[in-house]
Amino acid sequence: MTRVGIFGGSFNPIHVGHIALAKAILERCELDEIWLMVSPQNPLKQQDDLLDDALRLEMAQLALRDVKGVKASDFEFHLPKPSYTWNTLQRLSTEYPDHRFTLIIGGDNWAHFEHWYHWKDILRNYNVVAYPRNQYPGTIRMPLMEISSTDIRRRICQGKPIDGLVPDAVAQFIMERRLYVEQ
């Protein structure tokens, strides 16, 4: 049985904090792989500044190309919208019966987990790992990285550098395509 962590998010854009977190959870939770599930739509977030799905997926793939055990996935792009986690996990379990899935979420989401669609079913059928985020504790102890995609987008819009906040390949991709320049 392959143990896979499902780390969903907008990744708008993916940054070094996402990657460091995925690598740490991969090791600490004894998972075989982590799939960064690039979400086309989060039912709990407004989507005004969400970059096109294909661009966010391509940035994630660029960022992860040399990261062992972590890969970007477009699985949710092919599901009905909105893409609720319960539906995603059910479909993954059907399509990958030889995999055991663990849901990876932030402590901010964990604090409000009882509002999630089919939250009790998720807890009954899957492991859930919550990492500390935005002053919310998680179910595992990890150092917090004070990096956010929102701040990165703001820096780009203001003409400030993003060196060290995103992988070099992602920074180049963003600059070549002039992404997030006018938000």
Region roles according to the model:
Residues 1-183:
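Nucleotidyltransferase catalytic core that binds NTPs
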